[in-house]
């Protein structure tokens, strides 16, 4: 098994797939960095007769197989939790992941669907922190300066961002009045929930997705 990391760069990922194709590998598993920009990788692999499997994220072009979770549903569950905790009324902020990546697109759709069902909930602001804890902390600090006590909840499209937002709120002395909810159920987030700091996170079986992708490649 040969593993490479595109670091969020769709163009770099395409180059990596092209390298694997030139090496005549037996199969390729890809976690697409973006839905559209990574679609050519699917076309190139198929043209070379090499099976390509998408793991965790989709592309516009259909791969030979896809293994992943329902990102829309995970966001719906998270935002429904927020709505219930706020009694269907309040101001929410949303931190996005990497723009154009399936998880970002679908989690946005799921969250917006629930907000549409709760007309007394207002989306104060939404920006990307690119799945990153440090970027999320900086963004949350800016939001605290901009919105202050208007903030009732923050929905972060992954746990890394949720933990960054949490740190900013704690340092500003604002956490007691603001819900922080993420997605993925990473170890740090689960511990934070157990410790009564972060409010909730949605489970995503990353290990199961990876195992499923390997099994699909062997088939």
PLM regions: where:
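A residue-level marker of the well-folded mature domains of exported/periplasmic proteins
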Residues: 1-219
């Amino acid at each position: 098994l040969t593993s490479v990391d595109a670091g969020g760069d769709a163009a770099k990922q395409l180059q990596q797939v092209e390298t694997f194709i030139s090496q005549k590998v037996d199969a390729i598993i890809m976690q697409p960095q973006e839905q559209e920009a990574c679609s050519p990788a699917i076309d190139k692999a198929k043209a070379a007769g090499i099976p390509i499997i998408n793991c965790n994220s989709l592309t516009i072009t259909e791969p030979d197989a896809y293994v992943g979770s329902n990102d829309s549903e995970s966001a719906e569950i998270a935002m429904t939790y927020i709505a219930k905790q706020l009694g269907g009324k309040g101001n929410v902020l949303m931190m996005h992941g990497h723009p154009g990546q399936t998880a970002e697109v679908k989690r946005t759709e799921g969250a917006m669907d629930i907000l549409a069902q709760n007309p007394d909930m207002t989306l104060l602001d939404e920006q990307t922190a690119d799945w990153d804890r440090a970027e999320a902390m900086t963004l949350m600090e800016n939001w605290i300066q901009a919105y202050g006590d208007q903030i009732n909840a923050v929905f972060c499209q992954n746990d890394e961002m949720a933990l960054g937002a949490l740190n900013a709120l704690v340092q500003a002395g604002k956490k007691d009045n603001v819900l922080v909810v993420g997605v993925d159920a990473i170890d740090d987030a689960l511990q934070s929930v157990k410790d009564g700091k972060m409010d909730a996170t949605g489970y995503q079986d990353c290990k199961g997705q990876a195992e499923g992708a390997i099994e699909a490649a062997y088939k």
